[in-house]
């Protein structure tokens, strides 16, 4: 199975990818880690990889027989949607995402949740901006996912996500 999970910041992509990976044994890849390399010396806590390195890492993942990818739907990873057997768009409510953004930011600042960036006020502001860009369609995530309607499943709520995980469990049984 080649699964691509896409959605805005704090929609639950990473959590769902890990859960699917645990249920199926298929490795999951967080594409933020393909774009960014952790670097504690940098003010942001990471740096952007050169495009050539990013693309090399991404194509190595796509060459695998199976994978679970998760990302915000960046244009540079559109090929991942093309190769996927199934695409999941997490279209959770803005209120839920904003709550998760704040909760995550607090947990990261108290070192209760790991992160590959510095959880400062700039990052908090950016997360709210990215969430809003999804809501308005400015980021193009929904539009890109809808290009693949024949293999797209849109999940809107934690209940729908739970039902999706149950269906994956039953497929594995």
What positions do the PLM features span?
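The conserved Walker
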Residues: 9
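Conserved substrate/cofactor phosphate-moiety recognition/catalytic segment
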Residues: 18, 22-65
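Conserved lysine of the Walker
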Residues: 13
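Hydrophobic anchor at the beta1->P-loop junction of P-loop NTPases
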Residues: 5
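A glycine- and Lys/Arg-enriched "phosphate-lid" helix/loop adjacent to the NTP-binding pocket
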Residues: 92-137
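NTP-dependent small-molecule kinase module
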Residues: 132-173
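Short, structured coil segments at secondary-structure junctions
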Residues: 24, 83-84, 148-149
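Glycine-rich phosphate-binding loop used to anchor ATP phosphates in small-molecule kinases
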Residues: 51-96
């Amino acid at each position: 199975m080649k699964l691509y999970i896409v959605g805005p910041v704090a929609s639950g992509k990473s959590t769902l990818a890990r859960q699917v990976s645990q249920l199926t044994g298929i490795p999951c890849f967080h594409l933020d880690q393909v774009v960014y390399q952790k670097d504690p010396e940098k003010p942001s806590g990471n740096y952007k990889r050169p495009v050539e390195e990013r693309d090399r890492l991404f194509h190595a993942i796509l060459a695998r027989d199976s994978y679970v990818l998760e990302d915000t739907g960046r244009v540079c990873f559109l090929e991942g949607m093309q190769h996927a057997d199934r695409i999941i768009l997490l279209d959770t409510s803005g209120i839920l995402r904003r709550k998760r953004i704040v909760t995550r930011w607090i947990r990261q600042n108290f070192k209760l949740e790991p992160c590959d960036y510095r959880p400062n006020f700039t990052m908090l502001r950016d997360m709210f901006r990215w969430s809003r860009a999804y809501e308005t369609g400015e980021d193009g995530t929904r539009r890109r996912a809808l290009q693949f309607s024949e293999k797209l499943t849109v999940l809107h709520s934690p209940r729908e996500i739970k039902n999706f995980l149950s269906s994956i469990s039953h497929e594995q049984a």
